[in-house]
Amino acid sequence: MTISRDKMIELEKRTIEEFKIDYLILMENAGMGIFHEINQYDSFTIICGKGNNGGDGLVIARHLILSGKIVEVFVVGDKESEEFSKNLEIIKKLTDVKYIEDDNFDELIESIEVNEITVDAIFGTGLNRKLNKFYRSLIDAINIHGNYIIAVDIPSGMDADTGEEYGNCVACNVTYAISDIKKGELLNSNVGELKKIYIGIVRYKDE
């Protein structure tokens, strides 16, 4: 079973507004679920956008750090979501956070090459625009230098409904689809292996 972007938004909204399950709880469930899938590895580069996909990435980073793993956190983007900001304040108490603010990716590339796993938590299913040169170059750097790449929910740069690439997208070994596999993920091989992560979205029996 797959789901559209709009249906996923509808289910999330219902879970939060009708059933009063805070988005931070869903984010925690997503991050914890992916943590349990990858905690057999020892070293990680986690690249987070400033939206809720990046918030999921910060939750993953926190649990990896608390379990004794080597974790380097990079943040990219402009406007922060409320949930991202809350998780950023937590992670700053546990480790140094590095910011990618121009097209000099040397520090990021060094981290990616040294660490076993690269976690793509830049863009989620809400992306619906062409990527600018900066983000295309960032994704190229990840694809070229990553040893083993996983995506949080969807590879950054991919349309959730069509699988279209908005210039390019992260080429993943594994994509951990949060709650449901998105329609577009079956239409683009850059997702790699697809696995679903249960987070407690409320749905009715006929959905």
Summary of predicted features, one role per range:
Residues 13-17, 32, 39-40, 96, ...:
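Generic secondary-structure signature for well-ordered alpha-helical cores
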Residues 1-41, 203-207:
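Positively charged, low-complexity intrinsically disordered leader regions
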Residues 2-4, 115-207:
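YjeF_N-associated NAD(P)HX repair module
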Residues 3, 19, 26, 30, ...:
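Catalytic cores of large soluble enzymes that bind and process phosphate-bearing ligands
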Residues 28-33, 47, 71-74, 195-201:
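S-adenosylmethionine-dependent methyltransferases
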Residues 35-122, 130-152:
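Nucleotide and nucleotide-moiety/phosphate-recognizing core
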